[in-house]
Amino acid sequence: MSLLSKIAMWAELLGSGEAKQRMLIGRQLAWRVRELESINEFADVEFSVFSQFGDDGIIQWLIHRLPGLSETFVEFGVGCYQEANTRFLLVNNNWRGLVLDSSRRKVHAISRDTISLLHDLQSVCAVVTAENIDQLMLDRGFEGDIGLLHIDIDGNDYWVWRG
């Protein structure tokens, strides 16, 4: 085994351990957050496992406060889906999801990620517009109420949401 192969193997093992620790800590924080009946501000429940900021905690608090939510999500503009607002929801709460990005390379990376094999996650390469979003969701079995819709497509968020 070459030195480079050994380094790659150790990097993967260490990365895997870090991911497990992040998930375990995230699950503990999610349990703490869901028990809070009220908060003064969203900062009271913020934590980040996969989100860029504290959105994982805010989402966990909200989904336990809003009765009757469909356990489905749609997120656009996800990149490679490593840092995303719905990833913790998928892994921790086992929601069903659809993620979309305009980069074929990034969507291919998502489809090859073990998260796509272990969870009910569909990834689609598409340029999302107000005109095509409904059909993109319908074509993949996402109709009716969506528990969480997350739009991050710099500059067109409002128009797609209105669509």
Task: Give the predicted meaning of each segment.
Residues 1-43:
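Membrane-proximal basic amphipathic "stem/tether" segments
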Residues 43-139, 143-151:
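SAM cofactor-binding core of SAM-dependent methyltransferases
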Residues 155-163:
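A short, conserved alpha-helix within the catalytic core of class I
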